[in-house]
Amino acid sequence: MPEPSSSSSPTMKPTLGLTGLTINAMALIAPGAFLWLTFQEQSLYGAPLAGCAMWFGIVCALLLCLATAVSYAELSKLYPGAGSSYFYAEQAFLSKTKAFKFARLAKFFTGWASHLYYWVYPGCMVGVTAILGGYLLNQFWPDTFSSTYDSPLFMILFCIVFSYGVAYIAFRGVTGTTAVNMAINIIQIAALVVFSIIAIAYRTKHTEGSVGYHLSNGVAVNYQVFQDTVKDDKGAPLPVLDANSKPTMDSAGKPVYQMADQTDKDGNPVPADANGKSTTVDKAAPFTLSYTVDQAYSKDSSGNVTFNFHPTAKSVIGPHSFNFVFIQACVAILILVGFESVTSMGEEAKNPKKDIPKAVVLSLVIQGAICYLFEYFAANYLLNSGYALPNAGASGSPIGDLMVITGTWLFGSYAAGRAFMLVQAFTVFLAMIGTTLACLSTGARVTYAMGRDDEVPSHFGLLHGRTLSPHRAIWTLATISAILGIVTVSCYLGGQSNPLAALDKHNIWYSFGIFSPEAYTKLPNTLLIITLISNFGTFLLYMTTCIVAIVAFREHHMFNGFKHLVVPVFGLLANLACMLFYLVGPWSVPGMSVKEPYIALGVAAVWGIYGWVYFVKKSKSTGKAVILTAKPAV
């Protein structure tokens, strides 16, 4: 392992035990935050059917991550020092009599691929937190901020402030970071359990035909609401479009027009009687819930099927379709990554050889296998005819909507339900601070490791004299995260199946960055693009790590056929399959857009080409051999 450039350079202090290491990894996974922040993305991509396999897709993604986690854990036993898989690759190849010649190449490829993940992921987190902030603005100032469109100006400003604010926490050092992460984990997991229990209780208490709640312009009510035809800017009624963007026809061959709930002068939903006519609340027809199969799956006039909700609990955990599972698994990778982050904290660990392997697996099992599977079951089971999956895909925060519904039912009023949602939103915001902090800190430490090794500019390999944090890498990553966060929010509503409602707020907060309602059916979803870029970096890193694990234990006295061959081979093939699926899936799976995955793949390809050019030029300028002819002196 390379030494610091100067013997007087400060080094990190070992302060973390098993609990501290596990907490830091758990902060990056953040199950309470990701349920809120990715449910819309998972509901929308692959619509109108792929959302039915959300829970099983997470199971498959979890198996992929567990295979990779085992590889990380085993490697950390051999090489407990700092640097994550970047140094694992070097040490694994250098330990072999023939493969040692590829040590520097393998090390650089691993580190460069990890940057596609570790540099993009924080930007994605900054962006989704800005979306959360935009959603909450409507809750506090509904007359100023739209319930459909988050303010572009606000989100841009938020991305800048949030990115540098979190970077400052990371700059202060790992000890403060661990304390913050522990507090945030306790709060968000408690909030997660509360919501999940309430969600399951709501579904079990509201049987077929019972009176339930739905949202009308964001307000939870249990009665029918008067509707009128939605019109465009010229006053013409807007038709309901099918999956092929063609007007839907009724049984008589006439167009079906979009309808919207109406409100009174105070912004309250206008009640409707059994005939759909406006009336008073005491005469309003009750809103009844349905879970029947014919309601769970609906067809338009062209025969296109849309999944709305799960008719039974068994349906929630079912795979439904191989293609749908792949779509959901490839997106779900975003919510599971982070377990490997503790391997970059080898220098901060008190007993790295013993504690890091345990922390890698523990963090994934606790949050992935327990928290995620429970909360995603609860959220999917809660869906019904009052709030279906298409509603979730068109919402800026579907989990926030569901919290309003369940809170209104449990506490007896919309005001109480809204307050319940705001409390939960606060815990999500805290979790996002912890998540962004953890991934930014991890990314900075990987860059620090490469900078200390002079594979990237050496100033990245310096530690701050007082805080002992890789300050150059942290502030650089903060700038990148702010930029990528802005890209994430620029068209986060793109890829809609149907046109959105027209913008109803016209002020400085919406002076730019808003497209026509129809444009959102054609524009790519930038949130999904950034997610997939990060995920492709993850797939490359995890594939490489599995290969490194195979190489490291080949002909080693600790070799175990299952842990060191079967498991990493499975992880390698599973990650590769996810990458390849995005090449072929858009051409064969209805509802899977070709735009987002191919843009993301293009970015990944450009990053790889640039990395190779940089590596070759750097090797020539420094006189380093790309292919080693002899093992370096220890």
Regions from the PLM with identified roles:
Residues I131-G134, I186-A236, K246, K254, ...:
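Hydrophobic alpha-helical segments and their helix-loop junctions in multi-pass secondary transporters
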Residues M1-C52, C65-L66, V70, K101, ...:
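Membrane-interface "cap" regions at the ends of multi-pass membrane proteins
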Residues M26-A33, C60-A67, Y72, Q188-Y202, ...:
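Selective recognition of specific alpha-helical transmembrane segments in multi-pass small-molecule
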Residues A30, T38, F56, Q188-A191, ...:
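A generic transmembrane alpha-helix motif of multi-pass inner-membrane proteins
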Residues P31-D150, F154-F158, I366, I599-G611:
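Extracellular loop-to-transmembrane helix junctions
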